[in-house]
């Protein structure tokens, strides 16, 4: 994506640290268009920072949890990406069975994921992989 510039990368799985880091980033880059928070704690921190600063930045999270789902429903977060634990479990069991038989395993295994937002958060297939 040549027209996208990554201005900073921070790591925080703690919501309070993430909120502080994101508020500082929003202050340093007032024209920032979007932020991706790569775990539940960071996504909660992103929602908090957006609410506390009044920022209009597009906010995307990862995983789920009640606070993150609520932030999607109230429009603070546009949506999130969640893992597919059923797909992960199926992939692990199938890979173990192949390994036991001495079969070659793929180097890359896609266990699946879901994008969810207001429009599909209640879809049974999506809701089944979300947690509170």
Name these PLM-found stretches:
Residues 1-132:
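A residue-level marker of the well-folded mature domains of exported/periplasmic proteins
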């Amino acid at each position: 994506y040549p027209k996208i510039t990554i201005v900073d990368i921070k790591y925080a799985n703690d919501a309070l640290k993430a909120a502080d880091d994101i508020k500082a980033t929003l202050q340093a880059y007032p024209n920032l268009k979007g932020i991706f928070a790569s775990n539940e704690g960071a996504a909660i921190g992103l929602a908090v920072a957006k609410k506390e600063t009044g920022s209009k930045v597009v906010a995307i999270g990862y995983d789920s949890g009640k606070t993150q789902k609520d932030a999607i429903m109230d429009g603070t977060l546009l949506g999130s990406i969640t893992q597919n634990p059923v797909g992960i479990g199926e992939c692990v069991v199938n890979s173990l069975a192949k390994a036991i038989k001495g079969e070659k395993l793929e180097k890359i295994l896609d266990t699946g994921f879901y994008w969810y937002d207001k429009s599909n958060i209640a879809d049974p297939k999506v809701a089944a992989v979300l947690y509170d």
